[in-house]
Amino acid sequence: MRDAMYSADPAREEWKQRVSEFAGSELFDRLFKEGMGLVEEAASYLDGPGRVDSRKLNRELALVFAAESMEVTTRLMQAASWLVVQRAVREKDMKVEEAGDEKYRLARTGEPHPVDRSVMPAQLMSLVDRSRALYERVWRFDTTLYSETPQPAENNVMKQIDRLRQAAEGGAFDPLSVWRR
């Protein structure tokens, strides 16, 4: 019954169509490729040249390097997860309503903490900047597509029945209620 209420709601149908169109668009394809490419690039750097770069740093800067690399990895994994969910919508492996679930939403990121970029490896700082930019774009898509998920239309018949029930419980239909008070 609940599915019938959702499917009859034009606003909800329009929302589902908009999400499906985005998931099937060239824009999404480019975003997906960019996101997955950045994930691969970050993994390659952090598992290879990044290890060498971090060993060249003093202890304090090595900790900053580790923190920044964890943030890059976290941002990219969250963005990649969101992109994979959208691809599942496109491939019809997941319903739009399921993709709209809160567990798939992205959180707004806080302000970045200050880092002396002049002493950190340029490749790491490039990954930091690009992962932030990608996450911000994906977050905006997430917010635009899912933040105002239409609710099922109000059922006016049920609303009227509820009003009648409340009135009856309050004695509105009892002709003798005037003398009982």
Language-model-detected regions and their locations in the chain:
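Surface-exposed peri-terminal alpha-helical interaction modules
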Residues: R2-R181
